[in-house]
Amino acid sequence: MSDDKSKALAAALAQIEKSFGKGAIMKMDGSQQEENLEVISTGSLGLDLALGVGGLPRGRIVEIFGPESSGKTTLCLEAVAQCQKNGGVCAFVDAEHAFDPVYARKLGVKVEELYLSQPDTGEQALEICDTLVRSGGIDMVVVDSVAALVPKAEIEGDMGDSHVGLQARLMSQALRKLTGHIKKTNTLVVFINQIRMKIGVMFGSPETTTGGNALKFYSSVRLDIRRTGSIKKGEEVLGNETRVKVIKNKVAPPFRQAEFDILYGEGISWEGELIDIGVKNDIINKSGAWYSYNGAKIGQGKDNVRVWLKENPEISDEIDAKIRALNGVEMHITEGTQDETDGERPEE
């Protein structure tokens, strides 16, 4: 670079730093070491692998959407439980006014340590979310759900009044404010969203999410969760078979998917995933109906092996670590300190 250009650039950089503070602009010359992306586990081993980085990335916006009763809130509560186990502080903005503390506790959430807000309007919900993020004291915020973020004008109006585009404008404005604060404070913000049908669509999917297009653009990760079947024991339904597709991913290759079981009253069957993925990766050996690990038989039939893994959490954690290492998605967690029960799943 010529001397004139160098002087002009130096003057411009000095002016920028004077106006906006040191660090407003910097040269990526290798002195800034690349840090490992911090993540929060989803509570599903298969989904952590599908995300490519071992979990949901911190400092980013994540959208989870799907039909009714597909497991959206369950997946978020599982992630909240994982965050709390690693010393994280979580908040739940319950715009739907449907939070169930009993169910959350069954999934492993420390309800007494969870900050819960049940706002009256969409503006109030997003302002609370922004204030929590800017504080820097929160590790994860869940907003449930975008569809329930009703603008104040709509609440104060009469039934049947037309409020075209109000919610979309509200979301667009809020996300413009939120995105910078989220990155600076390294907070994970998860928006749960619902599906609607577009009228008159002849080609392509008629499904769309609520709240306009802003959330689609600002989200670093978008997850499409669907119920694919039921888990039965005789005539009794024990849970749902679930599939999650990574529709968008800015931190790893997208379009991967994970399948797992959600058991009623227990949540995601982590042990079931360990068995399936462990067999697939040749970490657990399967011969007929028998399963073995490190040359020793651990059970006959998947249900018996699940019980054995639940009773031996140290072996479960060992298998989990081997699977993550083999797939190159070891989690990098720096916030908080784990306690002695971190490796254990909640009791049924």
Swiss-Prot record:
Keyword Nucleotide-binding (UniProt): yes
Effect on the protein of changing residue 57 to R: In strain: MS11
Superkingdom field: Bacteria
Gene3D superfamilies: P-loop containing nucleotide triphosphate hydrolases
GO biological process assignments: DNA recombination; DNA repair; SOS response
GO cellular component terms listed in the entry, alphabetical order: cytosol
Compartments reported by the entry: Cytoplasm
Pfam family of the protein (one): RecA
UniProt: ATP binding residues: 66-73
Gene Ontology MF terms in the entry: ATP binding; ATP hydrolysis activity; ATP-dependent DNA damage sensor activity; damaged DNA binding; single-stranded DNA binding
Keyword Heme tagged: no
Keywords: ATP-binding, Cytoplasm, DNA damage, DNA recombination, DNA repair, DNA-binding, Nucleotide-binding, SOS response
Function description: Can catalyze the hydrolysis of ATP in the presence of single-stranded DNA, the ATP-dependent uptake of single-stranded DNA by duplex DNA, and the ATP-dependent hybridization of homologous single-stranded DNAs. It interacts with LexA causing its activation and leading to its autocatalytic cleavage.
NCBIfam families attached to this UniProt entry: tigrfam_recA
Family: Belongs to the RecA family.
Protein name as annotated: Protein RecA
Organism: Neisseria gonorrhoeae
Gene name of the encoded protein: recA
